[in-house]
Amino acid sequence: MSCPVIELTQQLIRRPSLSPDDAGCQALMIERLRKIGFTIEHMDFGDTQNFWAWRGRGETLAFAGHTDVVPAGDVDRWINPPFEPTIRDGMLFGRGAADMKGSLAAMVVAAERFVAQHPHHRGRLAFLITSDEEASAKNGTVKVVEALMARNERLDYCLVGEPSSTEIVGDVVKNGRRGSLTCNLTIHGVQGHVAYPHLADNPVHRAAPFLNELVAIEWDRGNDFFPATSMQVANIQAGTGSNNVIPGELFVQFNFRFSTELTDEIIKERVHALLEKHQLRYTVDWWLSGQPFLTARGKLVDAVVNAIEHYNEIKPQLLTTGGTSDGRFIARMGAQVVELGPVNATIHKINECVNAADLQLLARMYQRIMEQLVA
C-alpha cells in the first residue's frame, strides 16, 4: 500500500537541491498546494527561491521549512546514491530525508488531509518555504520575513519542521533558540626577526593574557529555559609559516551562543572593555547571526504537546539547545514559534536516513496541530 508522505519525500530527495539551488522542489510543493486552494506568492531574492502560500483568513498558522540540503560528501560511502531514495529495514535513506524533506512532505500531506476535512476552516493556513537555509541564509527566510513585516502581514503561530527529535519523533520540541554572535578580532603587533624581539611586538604574546581571561569568564548561569551562555574560540591564525619571523598580526575568531540573560550589546561591551584593559591594538568585526527567542507555554506549544501525546503517548521535552534555525527570523514577527520534526541522529551525515513510519506519524501530528489552531 502506497503512502503519500513517503512518496512525496522520495520525489523531493530525487531533486539534488544543494543550497541555494531549489532544483524543482518548490514547484512540486506548489503544484500540490494550488490544487487545494492555496494562493502562491513567489518571493525570490538573488539566487534563492522562496514562496509564501496561504489559504483562508484570520488567525494564521504557518508551516516553515527549507528545500535546500548540504553536500552529500563521499558518495562512495553511501549505501545508495544520496539522491536516489531507498528504503531498507523501514529506514528511508537519502540526502535531506531528515533535514528536512521528510518534514516538508509531511506538511503538504497534512494540509491536503486537513483541507479535505475542513474546507471552510476558520483561520488561515500558510507556508513559508526557502531554498537558502543551509548556506548563507541571507536571501531566504530573513528576506521573506522583512517583506511580510513591511506590509504588516499577520503571523500568529509558526511550526518549523527542523529535525528536533533525538530518539523517537516528538521526544524533543524546540520552543526557542539561543542567540549567536561571532567576533572576528585582529590583534596588531610589529613583525620582526625572532632573534631581535626588541625590534618587534609579538601580537600572540600580547593577546595571550586577554584570551586566558576571556575563556575563564562565566557570562551567565542560564535560566529555566536556556543553558548558560557559551563562548568558544573557533579559529586562531598568526605567522608566516616560517620559524624565524615574529608575526605582525594575530587573528582570533570566537562565537557566543547566548541566552536571554544577555544581549549582544552587553557581550560586545564586556569584550571591548577586556581588550582595553590589556592595552591591545586591535580591529574587530562583529556578526550577529540571530537573537535568542523563546515561545512560552501558550496555544502553539499546547497544541504541539497535545499532538505528540495523542499520537506517540509521550510527554515531549521543551528545549532551546542546539544551533540556530530560521525560527529566529520568524520570531521577529511576534509569532509563537516551535520546531517539531523527525529524529536528527543522521542529519548532514553519510547515509542520512529517517524512519519511514515516523514521517507518517509526523504528518498526523501536523494535521492535529492545524485542527487545534485554525479549524
Curated annotation (Swiss-Prot):
<comment type="function">
    <text>Catalyzes the hydrolysis of N-succinyl-L,L-diaminopimelic acid (SDAP), forming succinate and LL-2,6-diaminopimelate (DAP), an intermediate involved in the bacterial biosynthesis of lysine and meso-diaminopimelic acid, an essential component of bacterial cell walls.</text>
</comment>
<dbReference type="InterPro" id="IPR050072">
    <property type="entry name" value="Peptidase_M20A"/>
</dbReference>
<protein>
    <recommendedName>
        <fullName>Succinyl-diaminopimelate desuccinylase</fullName>
        <ecNumber>3.5.1.18</ecNumber>
    </recommendedName>
</protein>
<dbReference type="Pfam" id="PF07687">
    <property type="entry name" value="M20_dimer"/>
</dbReference>
<dbReference type="GO" id="GO:0008777">
    <property type="term" value="F:acetylornithine deacetylase activity"/>
</dbReference>
<feature type="active site">
    <location>
        <position position="68"/>
    </location>
</feature>
<dbReference type="InterPro" id="IPR001261">
    <property type="entry name" value="ArgE/DapE_CS"/>
</dbReference>
<keyword id="KW-0457">Lysine biosynthesis</keyword>
<dbReference type="GO" id="GO:0019877">
    <property type="term" value="P:diaminopimelate biosynthetic process"/>
</dbReference>
<feature type="binding site">
    <location>
        <position position="66"/>
    </location>
    <ligand>
        <name>Zn(2+) 1</name>
    </ligand>
</feature>
<comment type="pathway">
    <text>Amino-acid biosynthesis; L-lysine biosynthesis via DAP pathway; LL-2,6-diaminopimelate from (S)-tetrahydrodipicolinate (succinylase route): step 3/3.</text>
</comment>
<keyword id="KW-0028">Amino-acid biosynthesis</keyword>
<feature type="binding site">
    <location>
        <position position="99"/>
    </location>
    <ligand>
        <name>Zn(2+) 1</name>
    </ligand>
</feature>
<comment type="subunit">
    <text>Homodimer.</text>
</comment>
<feature type="binding site">
    <location>
        <position position="162"/>
    </location>
    <ligand>
        <name>Zn(2+) 1</name>
    </ligand>
</feature>
<dbReference type="InterPro" id="IPR011650">
    <property type="entry name" value="Peptidase_M20_dimer"/>
</dbReference>
<dbReference type="GO" id="GO:0008270">
    <property type="term" value="F:zinc ion binding"/>
</dbReference>
<comment type="similarity">
    <text>Belongs to the peptidase M20A family. DapE subfamily.</text>
</comment>
<dbReference type="InterPro" id="IPR002933">
    <property type="entry name" value="Peptidase_M20"/>
</dbReference>
<dbReference type="Pfam" id="PF01546">
    <property type="entry name" value="Peptidase_M20"/>
</dbReference>
<keyword id="KW-0170">Cobalt</keyword>
<keyword id="KW-0862">Zinc</keyword>
<dbReference type="GO" id="GO:0009014">
    <property type="term" value="F:succinyl-diaminopimelate desuccinylase activity"/>
</dbReference>
<dbReference type="GO" id="GO:0009089">
    <property type="term" value="P:lysine biosynthetic process via diaminopimelate"/>
</dbReference>
<dbReference type="InterPro" id="IPR005941">
    <property type="entry name" value="DapE_proteobac"/>
</dbReference>
<feature type="active site" description="Proton acceptor">
    <location>
        <position position="133"/>
    </location>
</feature>
<feature type="binding site">
    <location>
        <position position="99"/>
    </location>
    <ligand>
        <name>Zn(2+) 2</name>
    </ligand>
</feature>
<keyword id="KW-0220">Diaminopimelate biosynthesis</keyword>
<dbReference type="GO" id="GO:0006526">
    <property type="term" value="P:L-arginine biosynthetic process"/>
</dbReference>
<feature type="binding site">
    <location>
        <position position="134"/>
    </location>
    <ligand>
        <name>Zn(2+) 2</name>
    </ligand>
</feature>
<keyword id="KW-0479">Metal-binding</keyword>
<dbReference type="GO" id="GO:0050897">
    <property type="term" value="F:cobalt ion binding"/>
</dbReference>
<feature type="binding site">
    <location>
        <position position="348"/>
    </location>
    <ligand>
        <name>Zn(2+) 2</name>
    </ligand>
</feature>
<dbReference type="InterPro" id="IPR036264">
    <property type="entry name" value="Bact_exopeptidase_dim_dom"/>
</dbReference>
<keyword id="KW-0378">Hydrolase</keyword>
